[in-house]
Swiss-Prot record:
Main location class: cytoplasm
Record protein name field: Lipoyl synthase
Compartments where found: Cytoplasm
Record keywords, A-Z: 4Fe-4S, Cytoplasm, Iron, Iron-sulfur, Metal-binding, S-adenosyl-L-methionine, Transferase
Annotated positions binding [4Fe-4S] cluster 2: 69, 73, 76
Keyword Iron-sulfur found: yes
Pathway field: Protein modification; protein lipoylation via endogenous pathway; protein N(6)-(lipoyl)lysine from octanoyl-[acyl-carrier-protein]: step 2/2
Enzyme Commission number(s) of this protein: 2.8.1.8
Cofactor annotation: [4Fe-4S] cluster
Residues holding [4Fe-4S] cluster 1: 43, 48, 54, 280
Gene: lipA
Source organism per UniProt: Oleidesulfovibrio alaskensis (strain ATCC BAA-1058 / DSM 17464 / G20)
């Protein structure tokens, strides 16, 4: 991240991004349960703006494979650093938390574990299986890393039969060297293409406000359409701290509606585009529509 990006002019947060914090007993109980079971959530680790709403409605996205990452994407609040071996008891604790929260749709994601031979794919599969064993009627969505393009690792996850396979491209390809220097845009598209070709419901997403143009956003939507992607999310990047890239622009809600209309016209059935949309925000909506 350049000094110029970090010192970009301050942009006042627009009114459509100001939300009421519905902190209540359910929020507190959800947070305490997650802590008691020694689990991580991406909601907390990434400082998601929807955390209070989601915890208050007994929903969470479970973050497996530890709380530190082997990569250092510029937008992300999850810390890079030394990582620990996978916790063999974690899949069962995720399943227990899902049962206690009475979840009907579970979202599982992870830090990126380039240190592991399979990138953590077997741990994903074990967690899916643990949730299914405890909650047979529960649908499961996984938000996976790119596994460094390892087709066998992807197949390990697919063999566990998640209901939704999510992998985010995050930003247009022209910005990867600055925003996702350890990732590869074409590799991410190939992962999505493979999952869709295998018959799975496939989802991806990106953020606005990191220096991209509207034309570039539409170009990403075109690329995702070409993979066969069923679901696309587009939301506004919010700077987690002063050490992260400054927000380059706040996209108006009307423009998000245009993104959604464009995607639907291109043939993507489910477009979720709004300033506060996040990859797993209201993730169960698609499953409800599908059923």
């Amino acid at each position: 991240m350049s000094a110029q990006e970090n010192s970009a002019p301050f942009l006042r947060i627009p009114p459509w991004l100001r939300t009421r914090i519905p902190c209540n007993r359910t929020y507190t109980a959800t947070r305490e349960l997650i802590g008691d079971l020694n689990l991580h959530t991406v909601c907390q680790s990434a400082k998601c703006p929807n955390m209070f709403e989601c915890f208050s409605s007994r929903t969470a996205t479970f973050l497996i494979l530890g709380g530190t990452c082997t990569r250092n994407c510029a937008f992300c609040n999850i810390e890079p650093g030394d990582v620990l071996p996978p916790d063999a008891g974690e899949p069962q604790r995720v399943a227990l938390a899902a049962a206690r929260l009475e979840l009907k749709h579970v979202v599982i994601t992870s830090v990126t574990r380039d240190d592991l031979p399979d990138g953590g794919a077997a741990h994903f599969a074990a967690t899916i299986q643990a949730v299914r064993s405890r909650l047979p009627r529960c649908t499961v969505e996984v938000l996976i890393p790119d596994f460094q393009g390892d087709a066998a690792a992807l197949q390990t996850v697919l063999q566990a039969r998640p209901d939704v396979l999510n992998h985010n491209v995050e930003t247009p390809p022209a910005h990867y060297s600055r925003i996702r220097p350890q990732a590869d845009y074409s590799q991410s598209l190939e992962l999505l293409r493979r999952a869709r070709a295998a018959g799975f419901t496939v989802k991806s997403g990106l953020m606005t406000g990191l220096g991209e143009t509207d034309a570039e956003v539409l170009g990403v939507i075109d690329d995702l359409c070409a993979t066969g992607c069923n679901i696309v999310t587009v939301g506004q990047y919010m700077r987690p701290s002063r050490r992260h890239p400054a927000v380059q622009r706040y996209v108006h809600p009307d423009m998000f509606e245009e993104y959604a209309a464009y995607g639907r016209a291109r043939g993507i059935p489910h477009m979720f585009c709004a300033p506060l949309v996040r990859s797993s925000y209201n993730a169960s909506m698609f499953v409800q529509e599908k059923n």
